[in-house]
Regions:
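Glycosyltransferases and closely related glycan-assembly transferases
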Residues: 1-13
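Short, charged/polar "capping" segments at the starts of alpha-helices
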Residues: 22, 37, 85-86, 119-125, ...
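A nucleotide-sugar donor-handling region in carbohydrate enzymes
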Residues: 22-92, 207, 211-216, 223
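Short internal beta-strands
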Residues: 28-30, 110-117, 182-183
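Conserved catalytic-core segment of nucleotide-activated headgroup transferases in glycan assembly
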Residues: 82-114
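Donor nucleotide-activated moiety binding/catalytic core segment of transferases
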Residues: 128-167
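Structural loop-to-beta junction motif characteristic of Rossmann-like glycosyltransferase folds
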Residues: 176-180
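Leloir-type glycosyltransferase catalytic cores
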Residues: 195-239
């Protein structure tokens, strides 16, 4: 209605695939891995992020001590879960826990596990049981308790995100902290292409039970998208 009334004095921009004819929009911002092209489509390398590193709050020193204890490193594990493509089984979560234990056994570290609303309760029990047996320096935080996110990212030394969490990967890839992606289940199609492309460009590393520092490229999806949108609007001669 607004577009009909104001005509060229307003421009319609839609983020993600609208599942409607593209002619109804002046501009669409769609992730590159969706493989959608049109003259009014801007592709982004990943999902748009709602924060950047400079906007993260400084966590109080006493709170850092509560989180890290006397450990040198903070490892942040972010887990997704059931999604439209697959439902990880119990062995997938057990295998993930074994890889985490392998990665942390020789590190002075505190492990913080952030869960998603998609993480099933059975998975939480498996992770908790595995970590209790082999690593006392951990805490699991449910989605309803996550008042530390995203600020905790500022004190993380290593980040591990499961492959199903595309938005979380895009957000954390924008930081300089080493980022590792763990495949909960076999990925295919556009998600696999997205992850392989990020790995090729140096934004992420595949998690195989080892954590290490590397020369990480920061994903600047937001900044690059703003530049593309501004260029598009200038070409459209917006006044």
């Amino acid at each position: 209605i607004l577009k009909t009334s104001l005509k060229n004095n307003v421009k319609t921009i839609h983020i993600q695939n609208p599942k409607l004819p593209f002619k109804y929009f002046d501009l669409l911002i769609i992730p590159e891995h969706d493989n959608v092209t049109a003259k009014n489509v801007i592709q982004t390398k990943g999902a748009l992020s709602f924060f950047n590193y400079n906007e993260l709050k400084k966590i109080e020193e006493k709170k850092i001590k509560l989180i890290k204890g006397n450990k040198k490193n903070l490892i942040l594990l972010m887990i997704g879960g059931n999604n439209k493509r697959y439902k990880p089984n119990n062995s997938d979560y057990y295998y993930l826990s074994m890889k985490i234990l392998e990665a942390t056994k020789n590190l002075s570290c505190q492990l913080v596990v952030l869960l998603s609303r998609r993480t099933p309760s059975k998975a939480v029990k498996i992770l908790n049981s595995s970590f209790l047996k082999h690593n006392e320096n951990f805490q699991i935080i449910t989605s309803s308790e996550q008042n530390l996110y995203p600020d905790i990212l500022k004190i993380a030394d290593y980040m591990i995100v499961t492959s199903d969490s595309v938005n979380m990967i895009s957000e954390t890839a924008s930081l300089s902290t080493p980022l590792f992606v763990s495949y909960l289940s076999k990925e295919t199609g556009k998600i696999l292409n997205f992850l392989k492309n990020l790995e090729k460009l140096g934004y992420i590393k595949n998690f195989e039970g080892k954590l290490f520092n590397y020369k990480k490229t920061k994903l600047n999806t937001n900044k690059e998208t703003v530049l593309k949108v501004n260029k598009f609007l200038r070409l459209q001669k917006i006044t």
